Amino acid sequence: YSSAASDVYKRQVPMSAIKAQLSTFSGQRQNIIHVNDYILIDDAYNASPDSIKASLSILSEFKTRGRKIAVLSDMLELGPDSPEYHKEVGRFIATTKVTDLFITGELSRHYIEEAWKENPSLHTRAFSSNGELIAFLETYLKKNDVVLIKGSNGMNLKEVSKALMA
């Protein structure tokens, strides 16, 4: 992960934020990849409220002339309080420097609803499938954008990451 940390540090993300996020990495998580003219933060393996907030913080602190785009899906297996956890993440999104929020999944709609309450200028869109999301992103992404892909493994956002890296 040292090359990823170096890349993030060059973009003037505080070292404390880098260390905090690196401590949560393992195996298939948090790959930072240069794709064409944008940066992809592929963290599509798993999601919890804390891990999504940590990833959003890293995205928010990236120094870029482009947009900061969060592509999120449902957090699965959170039990009966799942809607509230999704709302909590939505409220957190409103406090970040994320410019665009794109989601898949029914519970993820809470992200948009809550984020809009505090930040109505946030550009958002909900997609009914990963295929629809991929088709949109392939034409939407521009030079210098930074894109975070984060969601529970069962939502299969890895499919989105792989398509963007192709």
Which positions does each model-derived feature cover?
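Short amphipathic alpha-helix with an adjacent loop that forms part of the alpha/beta core around
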Residues: 134-140
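Gly/charged, well-structured mid-domain segments that form the phosphate/adenylate-handling core
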Residues: 10-41
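Residue-level marker for buried hydrophobic side chains located in beta-strands
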Residues: 40, 70-71, 147
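ATP-dependent carboxylate/acyl-activation modules
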Residues: 28-31, 154, 158-160
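Single conserved hydrophobic/aromatic residue that forms the stacking wall/gate
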Residues: 1-5, 9
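Short acidic-hydrophobic, aromatic-tinged amphipathic segments that line or gate anion-handling sites
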Residues: 123-133
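Active-site beta-alpha connecting loops in nucleotide-dependent enzymes
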Residues: 26, 44-119
